[in-house]
Amino acid sequence: MSVSLSRLERQLGYTFKDQELMVLALTHRSFAGRNNERLEFLGDAILNFVAGEALFERFPQAREGQLSRLRARLVKGETLALLARGFDLGEYLRLGSGELKSGGFRRESILADALEALIGAIYLDAGMEAARERVLAWLTTEFDSLTLVDTNKDPKTRLQEFLQSRACELPRYEVVDIQGEPHCRTFFVECEINLLNEKSRGQGVSRRIAEQVAAAAALIALGVENGHE
């Protein structure tokens, strides 16, 4: 193992028994050979479970939708990339030449994906308890800053934060119809996001309200919220 990877292990607070797992977790798909996408998939599932379990215990009075919104804040790409930068993770990534030249080692989505891959690698290396311990340790500051007040956000904000947590494009809203007299109009809005095959729709007495209704419908269609809070 190189000295540099030993340094990264100290920053992560974890020493790998199988160092090939660590190297694989740091290997982007632009690099020749095997890459970290499967580990990222596994790490994403573990991260969501550990965060959800911790929130379930920490906020016993919270409703399902509130817990989902808190978790989205914890696991969003911005949060993960910030943690990754704290570990100087970009210095250790294995990137293809094109990705390296374009500054991929600084890109939020690549950093967040690599951190999730490391979570998956730790799980395979030492099991669930080791992965849980590292996730909770890394997210201590974020956990401590959460309150249920954080869930009192409008649907558009909640949808945006959820999509950012998945490194997805932001939603696009379009007014498709306006009905009624000038003093009593009804606006019809469609919300388009890449994760859904169909557009979500909303209507209201203003464009702003119609957009909020469409965003709420999108959250339900995504399974993030159940619409029964």
Swiss-Prot record:
GO molecular function: double-stranded RNA binding; metal ion binding; ribonuclease III activity; rRNA binding
InterPro entries reported for this sequence: dsRBD_dom (IPR014720), RNase_III (IPR011907), RNase_III_dom (IPR000999), RNase_III_sf (IPR036389)
Catalyzed reactions: Endonucleolytic cleavage to 5'-phosphomonoester
EC supergroup of this enzyme: hydrolase
EC number of this enzyme: 3.1.26.3
Catalytic center residues: 44, 116
Pfam families: dsrm, Ribonucleas_3_3
Subunit structure: Homodimer.
Name of the protein described by the UniProt record: Ribonuclease 3
Origin species: Pseudomonas syringae pv. syringae (strain B728a)
Gene name per UniProt: rnc
